[in-house]
């Protein structure tokens, strides 16, 4: 029978030779190569944990729409600017971030994200630059998520519980299309204007007042924490009335999207109107289903109408071939995002 011995290997691992003359690891010392390897493993575990945490924070940010901490938002915005500047990417403040910078001279108190934009084909920016930029942000600790759509590339990033929405627009008929379908004349972006904001120099559309009126309507100077969605939808040209009333019918295929409308008692609503902004208005059948076809999986705005009830669902993620359910919230008729659930 073998003699039991204990020794330390050159890798600082503690071994024991048992009675069967087999090596058995019984511990290690935090020295040398093993300590370094253990440190690397710990670092990778922390990175994976942080990535899962930031991914969860991103999804949660869409659900809760919690206002940003202004000091943290300022720090993240300045860091993002530094990164994009070093990569040679021209970007501008857009939507709520631009609105706050121009109207409020700071972040809007209830704003929940940082809105940045670039235009493919302007200022030397190309679509091929997007992926390397995403890699750079990942290496610097940002969680990133890329979505490619017909009219833009949408890059959501998360760091320090701050969501950054960087949208890279394609030019469509001399416009760039802001969600949920607002056409912004590209000439407002061609020669960007410098402003002082958050202790740094940033670019905004030029003139910013015209841009904000195009996005938010003529009353953009009036602060609104809710209800602004209707002002934005009013800026979008709807489909002609004869197309708006078109329907697929009861027979549908795997590409048909359905939204079932329920009332406050959970009962299906017949003849409710479901407006999918830019894509038509559809009437529900006896089972409460509205049926329509979408061009792609994307974010969409919907307006639900029946009897005296109306609610704007400003930002919903819809895919082809999926059935969703709408349930009203008696406490509100505006401001909900991701209110639909899958059936």
Predicted regions and their residues:
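Helical scaffold of the NTase/Pol beta-like nucleotidyltransferase catalytic core
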Residues: 9-94
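Short acidic, Pro/Gly- and aromatic-enriched capping/linker segments at domain boundaries
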Residues: 178-194, 280
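Active-site nucleotide-donor binding segment shared across nucleotidyl transfer reactions
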Residues: 81-114, 120
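Conserved catalytic core of two-metal-ion nucleotidyltransferases
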Residues: 62-87, 133-180, 196-202, 226, ...
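Conserved structural position at the C-terminal beta-strand
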Residues: 304-306
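Short, ordered, surface-exposed loop/turn motifs in non-cytosolic proteins
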Residues: 256-257, 265-278
């Amino acid at each position: 029978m073998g003699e039991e011995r204990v020794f330390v290997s050159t890798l600082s691992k503690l071994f024991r030779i048992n009675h069967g003359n087999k090596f058995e690891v019984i511990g290690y010392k935090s020295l040398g190569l093993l300590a370094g390897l253990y440190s690397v493993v710990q670092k990778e575990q922390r990175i994976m944990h942080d990535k899962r945490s930031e991914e969860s924070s991103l999804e949660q940010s869409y659900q809760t729409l919690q206002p940003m901490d202004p000091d943290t938002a300022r720090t993240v915005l300045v860091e993002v600017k530094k990164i994009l500047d070093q990569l040679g990417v021209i970007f501008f403040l857009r939507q709520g971030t631009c609105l706050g910078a121009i109207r409020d001279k700071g972040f809007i108190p209830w704003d929940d994200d940082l809105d940045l934009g670039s235009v493919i084909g302007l200022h030397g920016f190309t679509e091929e630059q997007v992926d390397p930029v995403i890699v750079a942000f990942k290496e610097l600790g940002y969680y990133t998520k890329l979505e490619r759509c017909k009219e833009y590339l949408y890059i959501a990033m998360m760091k320090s519980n701050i969501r950054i929405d960087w949208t890279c627009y394609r030019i469509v008929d001399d416009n760039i299309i802001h969600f949920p379908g607002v056409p912004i004349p590209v000439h407002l972006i061609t020669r960007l204007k410098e402003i002082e904001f958050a202790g740094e120099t940033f670019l905004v559309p030029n003139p910013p007042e015209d841009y904000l009126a195009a996005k938010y309507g003529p009353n953009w100077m009036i602060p609104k924490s809710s209800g602004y969605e209707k002002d934005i939808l009013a800026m979008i040209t709807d489909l002609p009335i004869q197309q708006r009333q078109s329907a697929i019918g009861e027979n549908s295929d795997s590409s048909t999207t359905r939204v079932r409308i329920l009332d406050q008692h959970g009962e299906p609503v017949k003849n409710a109107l479901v407006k999918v902004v830019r894509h038509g208005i559809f009437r529900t059948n006896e089972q409460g289903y509205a049926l329509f076809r979408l061009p792609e999986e994307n974010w969409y705005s919907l307006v639900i109408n029946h009897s005296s009830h109306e609610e704007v669902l400003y930002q919903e993620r819809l895919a082809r071939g999926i059935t969703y359910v709408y349930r009203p919230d008696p406490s509100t008729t505006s401001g909900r995002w991701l209110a639909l659930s899958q059936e």
